[in-house]
Amino acid sequence: MKILYSQRRFYHVETLFNGTLALSGRDQETTGFAWWAGNARLINLSGKLLGAHVAHAGLIVFWAGAMNLFEVAHFVPEKPMYEQGLILLPHLATLGWGVGPGGEVIDTFPYFVSGVLHLISSAVLGFGGIYHALIGPETLEESFPFFGYVWKDKNKMTTILGIHLILLGAGAFLLVFKALYFGGIYDTWAPGGGDVRKITNLTLSPGVIFGYLLKSPFGGEGWIVSVDNLEDIIGGHVWLGSICIFGGIWHILTKPFAWARRALVWSGEAYLSYSLGAIAVFGFIACCFVWFNNTAYPSEFYGPTGPEASQAQAFTFLVRDQRLGANVGSAQGPTGLGKYLMRSPTGEIIFGGETMRFWDLRAPWLEPLRGPNGLDLSKLKKDIQPWQERRSAEYMTHAPLGSLNSVGGVATEINAVNYVSPRSWLATSHFVLGFFFFVGHLWHAGRARAAAAGFEKGIDRDFEPVLSMTPLN
């Protein structure tokens, strides 16, 4: 059996639907690609590749719709979302659907509608995917030149890039319109413990919006993850949507400059590597966002952040012991520092004990008790509201800790419940997937650069076990 490595050889693919029963184009000799590199058979078959992409979109949307309906079917309104292992309903609730003051679910019908709409959409996409994969033209260049392309055609590639950017910009504006005009979105900072509201006075100042990008990613700075109000989030989407749309128009109307033509590799595998790299970055950022940010991901739906649960514990015991007569302002802990309250490195009054490391935390249930110099002692003595006590006790017992077998909470805690926070799931999954995508980026970037340099070989398959096995048929 002759082993073929080069990508530059066999492109013609016959399928069952082209009027012949010969199954060529499925094996290594006729295509130059082994079974596990099946997608590579579609490199120059734009029609079939379109089918693969549309079918893939159908699978994604089907999962969204089916999982959405599954969560609706299992949802218990009396329990918080984060106790029920939900990951889709919290996103819908954050967008302001079906919830009222304090994040209480008042109507699950919008969630049902969302699931059904996704299922119907997935059927349309699935049909389109199967049609283009099996029945439609193998290549689009001849019959539909607008949708056809050659990977090396730099002008066409940047036009496609432009169209994608415009679609992304439109997506960003969908959130803006929902927040401004279509009922508003859930604001965890609304007075009295959160509510749905329309976002009226957006932050459009470039100094504020782009200032986030200039922040340090560490500690109390937190780069863009430190955003703590919806005005900045929606204003940021206005900026981002506008940049994407104008950038898209720019890329459609212009051809790549000489420096870009020289610097970049212009092949299908190179574009794949660029995309994987971008998605890896998004995955890592999303991981940090869902783990630390309780404005974009309200704790009412996703459970408290780690720092929030820790500070909630300190607050809960401060309330208890103060009721029992402790003077929380002067009580000394076992280390000689304040037992309940101490000073931060910059002089603010903060919670004492182990939670001192989380003194940066800002949370809606805690902020009303701060004054100009951190926590206000007189407010802690006179102004603590019952809703703040209830919420902190709830958050204290729902820290985003837990193991794969769903035994949640601190490992040594005797009252641990069968609970793992959606924050743990979402942060971990996005980190792990982001890492996998990053490895894929390195792999495909290396192959694309090697191919461009003219020595692309792929994996040396001379000693692959499957080659010495008897054929399956």
Curated annotation (Swiss-Prot):
A Gene Ontology molecular function term of the record: metal ion binding
The propeptide sits at: 1-14
Q: Where in the cell is it found?
A: Plastid, Chloroplast thylakoid membrane
Whether Nucleotide-binding counts among this entry's keywords is no
Membrane topology, from the record: Multi-pass membrane protein
Question: GO cellular component terms?
Answer: chloroplast thylakoid membrane; photosystem II
The residues listed in the UniProt record as binding [CaMn4O5] cluster, with positions renumbered to this chain, are E367
Q: Tell me, which GO biological process terms does this entry list?
A: photosynthetic electron transport in photosystem II
User: Which UniProt keywords are present, listed alphabetically?
Assistant: Acetylation, Chlorophyll, Chloroplast, Chromophore, Manganese, Membrane, Metal-binding, Phosphoprotein, Photosynthesis, Photosystem II, Plastid, Thylakoid, Transmembrane, Transmembrane helix
PTM sites of type N-acetylthreonine:
T15
Quaternary structure (record)? PSII is composed of 1 copy each of membrane proteins PsbA, PsbB, PsbC, PsbD, PsbE, PsbF, PsbH, PsbI, PsbJ, PsbK, PsbL, PsbM, PsbT, PsbX, PsbY, PsbZ, Psb30/Ycf12, at least 3 peripheral proteins of the oxygen-evolving complex and a large number of cofactors. It forms dimeric complexes.
The entry sums up its family as follows: Belongs to the PsbB/PsbC family. PsbC subfamily.
Q: What does this protein's UniProt record list under function?
A: One of the components of the core complex of photosystem II (PSII). It binds chlorophyll and helps catalyze the primary light-induced photochemical processes of PSII. PSII is a light-driven water:plastoquinone oxidoreductase, using light energy to abstract electrons from H(2)O, generating O(2) and a proton gradient subsequently used for ATP formation.
Q: What is this protein called?
A: Photosystem II CP43 reaction center protein
Whose protein is this, by species?
Physcomitrium patens
